[in-house]
């Protein structure tokens, strides 16, 4: 996306986007190996078409490495861990590229190049409304406590309150962040304007509902902290020396940020006050590849970071120490991992190689198995979300998940994946020694 691209991007290596009948003469596109955001907005691609389930490409990629060296050897997936999957819906609207997806309380929200956020009702996955503004390009979405937060290409965040009136879904526009009045007053008072508004495009949003906090990350290398109660900016974190691509918040309030400097940083909030309410606790290196996406398991035990080299690095939270230790890297994508999602024991990744991979995680988090490769998009997959179970009456098993993928080809796809045999439970795993939990 040109407006999300860092300035002065250097020439990059090339890669291929699938192009249907023209596969024999593929078109070349750029892949970033630098610390700059690759541009996807001008990608030519084949006209989207409805997809059918394809043959599963099987490969197992795990690593017990102590540091991110990526010396991984692909291993064939045994049939025991293969999955049944299919595309249950494929929708193309005249909105352009799909840039963001969020799911909450039976509704899916999708943002695109246009000025409309489309709302889809589950389980039938039928469109039931739109949220429109004068601004275009919805680059990030998050829904929490019946509020919808959307970041736009103009660097502002719009907020709606969701209500239900006799079964009819309604959204009431609440505010635009930063508020125009506050911005003008700060300007007149001679205050630093950068403390009010991002100076670059917003790339990600995250909510810490328990602390009444909204976070926004930007290509301007900062994370802004907004108090939800009055929608005021209360802090600007100079988080990275390079553009920030992704943020995620744990249930305990720990903030994770990922950037083009090939690191993931961990921040904690200081409730004692001071000039810096958020302090850096640790920096996690991801070799030399910019980190484009983040995902955290529901229990906060595993952190995933998708990189431009196609690897998904992951870190394990120590049971007793609380420290994050490098666990390995998942290999399979041939190009940048643009988005990640985690639900139950599933990890789902979307890539610039136009595929979505589904991984199963063992109970201890150390071993991962790729059980499905979802093929059908004609452009890079930019956004993804996943939730447990199936749509409608398709409740074949309890261990399945539903995945929504949004691509720069403008197509929104819905998939259902069912693992034939779940990974061994922790009760079947061999006992672990104390030395595995403590550094002795």
Predicted regions and their residues:
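A short helix->beta-strand "capping" segment at the edge of beta-propeller domains
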Residues: 71-94, 124, 186-194
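Short C-terminal beta-strands that terminate individual repeats in beta-propeller domains
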Residues: 88-93, 127-133, 173-179, 192-197, ...
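Structural hallmark of WD40 beta-propellers
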Residues: 106-109, 146-149, 203, 211-215, ...
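WD40-repeat beta-propellers
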Residues: 117-121, 157-161, 217, 223-226, ...
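Short loop/turn segments immediately following beta-strands, especially the blade-tip
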Residues: 161-169, 268-275, 316-322, 360-366, ...
């Amino acid at each position: 996306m040109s407006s999300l691209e860092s300035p002065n991007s250097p020439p990059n290596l090339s890669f291929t986007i699938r192009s249907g009948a023209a596969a024999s003469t593929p078109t070349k596109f750029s892949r970033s190996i630098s610390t700059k955001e690759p541009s996807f907005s001008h990608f030519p691609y084949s006209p989207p078409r409805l997809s059918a389930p394809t043959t599963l490409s099987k490969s197992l990629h795990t690593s017990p490495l102590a540091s991110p060296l990526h010396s991984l050897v692909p291993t064939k997936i045994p049939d025991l861990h293969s999955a049944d999957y299919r595309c249950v819906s494929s929708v193309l609207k005249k909105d352009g590229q799909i840039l963001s997806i969020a799911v909450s309380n039976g509704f899916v929200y999708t943002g695109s190049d246009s000025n409309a956020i489309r709302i889809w009702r589950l389980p039938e996955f039928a469109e039931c409304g739109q949220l429109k503004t004068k601004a275009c390009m919805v680059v990030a979405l998050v829904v929490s406590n019946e509020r919808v937060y959307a970041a736009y290409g103009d660097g502002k965040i719009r907020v709606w309150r969701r209500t239900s009136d006799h079964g009819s879904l309604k959204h009431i526009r609440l505010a635009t962040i930063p508020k125009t009045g506050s911005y003008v007053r700060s300007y007149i008072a001679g205050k630093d304007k950068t403390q009010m508004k991002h100076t670059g495009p917003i790339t990600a949003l995250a909510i810490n509902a328990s602390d009444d906090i909204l976070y926004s990350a930007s290509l301007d290398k900062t994370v802004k902290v907004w108090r939800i109660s009055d929608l005021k900016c209360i802090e600007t974190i100079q988080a990275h020396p390079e553009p920030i691509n992704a943020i995620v918040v744990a249930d305990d309030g720990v903030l994770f940020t990922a950037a083009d400097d090939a690191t993931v940083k961990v921040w904690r909030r200081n409730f004692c006050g001071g000039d810096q309410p958020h302090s850096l606790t640790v920096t996690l290196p991801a070799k030399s590849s910019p980190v484009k996406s983040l995902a955290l398991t529901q229990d906060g035990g595993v952190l995933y970071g998708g990189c431009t080299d196609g690897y998904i690095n992951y870190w394990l939270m120590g049971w007793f120490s609380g420290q994050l230790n490098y666990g390995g890297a998942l290999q399979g994508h041939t190009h940048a991992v643009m988005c990640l999602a985690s639900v139950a024991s599933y990890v789902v990744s979307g890539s610039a190689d136009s595929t979505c991979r589904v991984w199963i995680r063992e109970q201890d988090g150390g071993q991962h198995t790729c059980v499905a490769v979802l093929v059908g998009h004609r452009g890079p997959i930019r956004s993804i979300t996943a939730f447990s179970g199936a749509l409608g009456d398709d409740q074949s098993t309890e261990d399945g998940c539903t995945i929504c993928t949004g691509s720069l080809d403008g197509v929104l796809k819905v998939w259902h994946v069912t693992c034939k045999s779940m990974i061994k439970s922790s009760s079947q795993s061999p006992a672990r020694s104390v030395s595995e939990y403590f550094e002795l």
